[in-house]
Amino acid sequence: MSELETFLIQNWENTELSKEYDIFVDDEVTGQQFQTDTGRIDILAISKDKKTLLVIELKRGRANDKVVGQLQRYMGFIKDEFLENGQKVKGLIIALEDDLGLRRALSVTSDIEFLRYKVKFELLNTHIN
């Protein structure tokens, strides 16, 4: 579990994602570090209308086109093993930066989006006696 993941989970309600999605919870299974047969989904969310499951993959630095295949494996698992009638699955990559390979791969993949995050670093003056 990364610091980025922890921060996003703890601050979910303060993000744009919370307007459309909630973090998936079903009985004792949660959408954080959601286990599949091809790895762990960082965050699994479900739309407020329960019609769309969103597979979120987080990358600390630069994301490249390899993450598209990883995300598609997770989305395939959700589609095959988890979706109920009428539901669909989408993917979201969140990273600090992207590269040309990722942009090319996403240009032909309509069910995966990319969002950049920004870190604000601030130094605070502290008075020590």
Give the residues covered by each predicted segment.
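Charged, terminal alpha-helix-loop-beta segments
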Residues: 1-129
